[in-house]
């Protein structure tokens, strides 16, 4: 667990907390002084040296190594891309849909996941969506659809709309028992608790820096299990995917033997500089401590919400950093929060409140004060005791 002193020290690194309560990390992490300094270092190198590509390449590889350590992978298993979409597209382009055609994914996926796999229908993919049961998708529902025709199971760890955490372990075991691959989109969870991709038995893992990794947009990381790399030949590619990008050979493709084969063009160097501080901060705090701190806050909020009879879209037993409440007018409720300098977000009828290392119990109490004053903008909980949508 983080100490009060540690949390205060973390908050002091983010200027926004001088004037606001920030509960929107599910959309974008706030800017820290360390990230700003990283960007200034990049600008200084550009000013002073013009094109110091050797220096920038060192930073690029340092980011790869730092993220690999963060998820307990090897640097050779990590690709650096400009977005989760770019990484997923690269993998999708490398798959062969002739023998196994099915792609099984839940209807809670972020749109980019659905769009990319639906686009593979042109290459023979049979895309099937697992229906939700209320605000959950049980592993048993995946089991009914995954079979020997299934090529890959793309899976979101935490749903962006309701905060539901998927039954990752069970779904992975079901998929692998049928010979299917598993891809985890961890954008809404990475940076909030420990990640060990080997222990999780994942084939692919993708996330980005702009949310709980406390970095900028425009940078994402993708893990590819080492045993798969050489067998996958992406058709979405570019010069930085080559074994030697600086061979400048336009007439031959010679892909890198590492996960770098899933990269595209020139790297987003400013974002690399800005990505490192967040990963470093979280690593220094210890991810077990970070997870315990977040869990304490989300459980406190859910307890208050249930006591008031407010309907939570987020199942209490699967809550991660994101708690979503059912609102009858989420746009108006957001404005009410903004009037009190509380930054949150909404998706359709859901008010999203996201917690991280810099949030406190005082933040929870401040939000609850606004919710109590505007309880008419929140849907009542179902009559069944302890139930959630």
Question: What is each model feature region?
Answer:
Residues 1-389:
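Pyridoxal 5′-phosphate
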């Amino acid at each position: 667990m983080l100490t009060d002193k540690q949390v205060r020290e973390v908050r002091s690194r983010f200027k926004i907390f001088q004037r606001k309560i920030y509960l929107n990390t599910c959309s974008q992490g706030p800017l820290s002084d360390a990230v700003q300094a990283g960007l200034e270092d990049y600008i200084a190198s550009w000013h002073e040296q013009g094109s110091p590509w050797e220096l920038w390449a060192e930073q690029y590889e340092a980011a790869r190594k730092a993220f690999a350590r963060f998820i307990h992978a090897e640097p050779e298993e990590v690709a650096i891309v400009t977005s989760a979409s770019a990484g997923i597209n690269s993998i999708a382009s490398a798959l062969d849909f002739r023998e196994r055609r099915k792609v099984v994914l839940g209807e809670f996926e972020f749109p980019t996941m659905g769009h990319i796999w639906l686009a593979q229908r042109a290459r023979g993919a049979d895309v099937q969506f697992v229906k939700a049961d209320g605000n959950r998708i049980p592993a048993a529902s995946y089991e009914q659809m995954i079979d020997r025709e299934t090529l890959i199971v793309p899976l979101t760890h935490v749903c962006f709309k309701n905060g539901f955490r998927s039954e990752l372990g069970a779904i992975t075991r079901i998929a692998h028992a049928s010979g299917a691959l598993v891809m985890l989109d961890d954008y809404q969870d990475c940076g909030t608790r420990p990640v060990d991709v080997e222990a999780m038995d994942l084939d692919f893992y993708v996330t980005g820096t702009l949310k709980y990794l406390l970095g900028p947009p425009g940078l994402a990381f993708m893990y590819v299990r080492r045993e798969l790399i050489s067998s996958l030949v992406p058709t979405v590619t570019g010069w930085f995917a080559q074994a030697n990008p600086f061979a400048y050979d336009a007439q031959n493709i010679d892909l890198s033997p590492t996960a770098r084969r899933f990269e595209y063009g020139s790297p987003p160097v400013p974002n690399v500089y800005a990505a490192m501080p967040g990963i470093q901060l979280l690593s220094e705090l210890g991810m077990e401590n970070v997870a315990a701190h977040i869990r304490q806050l989300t459980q406190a909020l859910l307890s208050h919400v249930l006591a008031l009879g407010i309907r939570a879209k987020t199942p209490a037993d699967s809550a991660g950093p994101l708690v979503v409440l059912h609102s009858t007018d989420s746009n108006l409720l957001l404005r009410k929060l903004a009037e009190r300098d509380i930054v949150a977000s909404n998706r359709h009828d859901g008010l999203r409140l996201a917690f991280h290392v810099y949030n406190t119990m005082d933040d929870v109490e401040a939000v609850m004060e606004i919710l109590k004053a505007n309880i008419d903008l929140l849907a009542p909980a179902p009559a069944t005791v302890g139930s959630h949508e």
